[in-house]
C-alpha cells in the first residue's frame, strides 16, 4: 500500500520525474519565475528550497551535492553567489506559489512559482535566440 508516501508521481517514471525537477529548478533559478501546473509547482518547491539552503551553507561538499541535483554550471554559480547572498537572513520560505487559473486546452490548474524578493529583470533572460538589426534587414529583403 502507498500510505503516507511523500512525493507525487506526476504520471512519470522516477528518472523522468528527477529530470523534470532538475530542469524546472534550473529554469526557476535562471528566470526567477516560471508558470507550470500546480502539482509540478508543489513538487518543485521543497526540491528548490533544499538547493537554496545548500547554496547558503556554501562549501565544497554542498557545492558537489548541488551540482549532482542541478547539472547546470551557470545556475549552480548563481545559486552559490547571488541567491545565497539574497537569502542570507531568511530561514526558508524562498519561493511563492500563486494560482494562475486553468489551462484552456485541458483545464489543468496552473500556477506561477517564483522566488521571493526576485530580480524582475531576470524574467525572460536568455530565453532563446534574439534577432539583431542585421538579421531583421536580411529577413525583410
From Swiss-Prot:
Any one of the GO CC terms: cytosolic large ribosomal subunit
GO biological process terms held by the UniProt record: translation
Molecular-function GO terms, alphabetical: structural constituent of ribosome
Keywords: Ribonucleoprotein, Ribosomal protein
InterPro entries according to UniProt: Ribosomal_bL17, Ribosomal_bL17_CS, Ribosomal_bL17_sf
Top-level division of the source organism's lineage: Bacteria
Chain intervals for the UniProt region annotation (Disordered): 120-141
UniProt key word Ribonucleoprotein: yes
Entry keyword Ribonucleoprotein: yes
A Pfam family reported for this protein in Swiss-Prot or TrEMBL: Ribosomal_L17
Sequence similarity: Belongs to the bacterial ribosomal protein bL17 family.
Subunit structure: Part of the 50S ribosomal subunit. Contacts protein L32.
UniProt cross-references to HAMAP family, sorted A to Z: Ribosomal_bL17
Name the record gives this protein: Large ribosomal subunit protein bL17
Organism: Novosphingobium aromaticivorans (strain ATCC 700278 / DSM 12444 / CCUG 56034 / CIP 105152 / NBRC 16084 / F199)
Lineage: Bacteria, Pseudomonadati, Pseudomonadota, Alphaproteobacteria, Sphingomonadales
Amino acid at each position: 500500500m502507498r500510505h503516507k508516501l511523500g512525493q507525487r508521481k506526476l504520471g512519470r517514471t522516477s528518472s523522468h520525474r528527477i529530470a523534470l525537477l532538475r530542469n524546472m529548478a534550473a529554469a526557476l533559478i535562471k528566470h526567477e519565475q516560471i508558470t507550470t501546473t500546480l502539482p509540478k509547482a508543489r513538487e518543485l518547491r521543497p526540491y528548490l528550497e533544499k538547493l537554496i539552503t545548500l547554496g547558503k551553507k556554501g562549501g565544497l561538499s554542498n557545492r558537489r551535492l548541488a551540482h549532482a541535483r542541478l547539472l547546470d554550471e551557470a545556475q549552480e554559480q548563481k545559486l552559490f553567489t547571488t541567491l545565497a547572498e539574497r537569502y542570507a537572513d531568511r530561514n526558508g520560505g524562498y519561493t511563492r506559489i500563486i494560482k494562475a487559473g486553468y489551462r484552456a486546452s485541458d483545464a489543468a490548474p496552473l500556477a506561477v512559482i517564483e522566488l521571493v524578493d526576485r530580480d524582475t529583470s531576470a524574467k525572460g533572460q536568455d530565453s532563446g535566440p534574439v534577432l539583431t538589426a542585421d538579421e531583421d534587414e536580411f529577413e525583410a529583403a
